[in-house]
Amino acid sequence: MEWENHTILVEFFLKGLSGHPRLELLFFVLIFIMYVVILLGNGTLILISILDPHLHTPMYFFLGNLSFLDICYTTTSIPSTLVSFLSERKTISLSGCAVQMFLGLAMGTTECVLLGMMAFDRYVAICNPLRYPIIMSKDAYVPMAAGSWIIGAVNSAVQSVFVVQLPFCRNNIINHFTCEILAVMKLACADISDNEFIMLVATTLFILTPLLLIIVSYTLIIVSIFKISSSEGRSKASSTCSAHLTVVIIFYGTILFMYMKPKSKETLNSDDLDATDKIISMFYGVMTPMMNPLIYSLRNKDVKEAVKHLLNRRFFSK
């Protein structure tokens, strides 16, 4: 009987929007368009940060990493989600679910840390402009970006390994679009208090600590901006931070609402799962990567000029 109750699962069923075929078709079209915008927008930012010598600075190096990160993050989930919208059998193998869970968590953690690094870069640029070339030299900002990726990979590997080792019962229905780690963890028929503790520690270290760094950095930046006597100087200083601050508010506002809101095991796996959670999850997974290049391009003259230069060069080369 114990063996029957602890069946070895080989696949999971992603419920998503099952039972709403019209909504699935609508979401397929919308998400496909958004994914194309994500690839084009973030791909353009990566190209200009590499090809334009004027953008070979720490700020745009971090921005290029952020754009590449957004492409990787969405590619781990959107294609499979689109396929599931058109497929009657919405299943994913255990190994495929583990890979998707690892990549999604790794990219999310990396983005949190990277946004903290970018805030520190803006702090040094505005509050210590004379020492900026020394503090944010290539020997500093390249390891900072690499460290963000390493932290994301290590954190995700540790959490994913602990989750896949859990015993799963017959219930293999994930009431989500993707293999989100918390939704998968709640399917286990074992005590998950250790996993929850590890997740709490990871959340504190890799989500809240970068957020604290961002808050401290921007508090000092605001104080420095108010000390600038000329209105032109204040405007120039604030414009260099407005795009990053907007991205931070959208990213952290969404992620904190998703993961800080208490959820019970019954709520995560019930048929009447709060639709707001799914909408916010979709917003976090698609809208944020799509908006990042738009925000940076609309609020940054250097990016606009670099895009124009790239387009003109391609046009005249033909």
From Swiss-Prot:
PROSITE patterns: G_PROTEIN_RECEP_F1_1, G_PROTEIN_RECEP_F1_2. Its main location: membrane. It comes from the Eukaryota. One of its GO terms (molecular function) is olfactory receptor activity. InterPro entries: GPCR_Rhodpsn, GPCR_Rhodpsn_7TM, Olfact_rcpt. It is found in: Cell membrane. It is a multi-pass membrane protein. Residues 47-54, 121-139, 218-237, 299-318 are cytoplasmic. The keyword Nucleotide-binding does not apply. Glycans are attached at N5. Disulfide bonds join C97-C189. GO terms for biological process: detection of chemical stimulus involved in sensory perception of smell. Keywords: Cell membrane, Disulfide bond, G-protein coupled receptor, Glycoprotein, Membrane, Olfaction, Receptor, Sensory transduction, Transducer, Transmembrane, Transmembrane helix. Pfam families: 7tm_4. SUPFAM superfamilies: Family A G protein-coupled receptor-like (SSF81321). Residues 1-25, 76-99, 161-197, 259-277 are extracellular. Belongs to the G-protein coupled receptor 1 family. Odorant receptor. This is Olfactory receptor 13C2.
